[in-house]
From Swiss-Prot:
Residues 119-131 have a biased composition (Low complexity). This is Ribosome-binding factor A. One of its GO terms (cellular component) is cytosol. GO terms for molecular function: ribosomal small subunit binding. The gene is rbfA. Belongs to the RbfA family. It comes from Anaeromyxobacter dehalogenans (strain 2CP-C).
Length: 138
C-alpha cells in the first residue's frame, strides 16, 4: 500500500477542484483579477493545504484579489472538501506565486531590448578549462 504518495495525490485533486471553483467565480467584489492556481502542497497528515496563486492585474488588483481569496478561504475549504469527500477538511493557506509575474517582467524586458536593437548579454561564465569563443574557432 503506497500511502506516502497520498498527500501529493490529494494536493493535485485539491488544486484541480479549487481551480474549477475559482473559474466559476466568487461573489466577493474584491476578486477582480484573473486568478491562476499554479500549485499546491499538502502536509503529510492532510491537515494543511498550501495553494500557490498567480493574480494578473496591477498591484492594487493583486492585493485586493488576494485579500478576497483569504477571506473566502473557509468557504473554499468546505466546497473542495465536499467535492473530494475528505474526512477532515485541510486548513487552506494561500501564497502569492511571483514566478509568473517575474517571467512576464523578464519577457517584457527582452522584448524591449530586441526592439531597441540590443541583444541581451549572456550572464553565463564559461566552464573552467573551456576555450573562449574566438579561440575555439581557430
Amino acid at each position: 500500500m503506497t500511502t506516502h504518495n497520498r498527500p501529493a495525490r490529494v494536493a493535485e485533486e485539491f488544486r484541480h477542484e479549487l481551480s474549477a471553483l475559482l473559474a466559476r467565480g466568487l461573489k466577493d467584489p474584491r476578486i477582480t483579477g484573473f486568478v491562476t492556481v499554479t500549485g499546491s502542497k499538502m502536509s503529510p497528515d492532510l491537515k494543511e493545504a498550501t495553494v500557490y496563486v498567480s493574480i494578473h492585474g496591477d498591484e492594487r488588483v493583486r492585493k485586493d484579489t488576494f485579500a478576497g481569496l483569504q477571506a473566502a478561504a473557509g468557504f473554499l475549504q468546505r466546497e473542495v472538501s465536499r467535492a473530494l469527500r475528505l474526512r477532515n477538511t485541510p486548513h487552506l493557506r494561500f501564497v502569492y506565486d511571483e514566478s509568473v509575474a517575474r517571467g512576464d517582467r523578464i519577457e517584457r524586458l527582452l522584448r524591449e531590448a530586441r526592439t531597441q536593437g540590443q541583444e541581451p548579454a549572456a550572464d553565463v561564465e564559461p566552464a573552467p578549462g573551456a576555450a573562449p569563443d574566438d579561440e575555439a574557432e581557430e
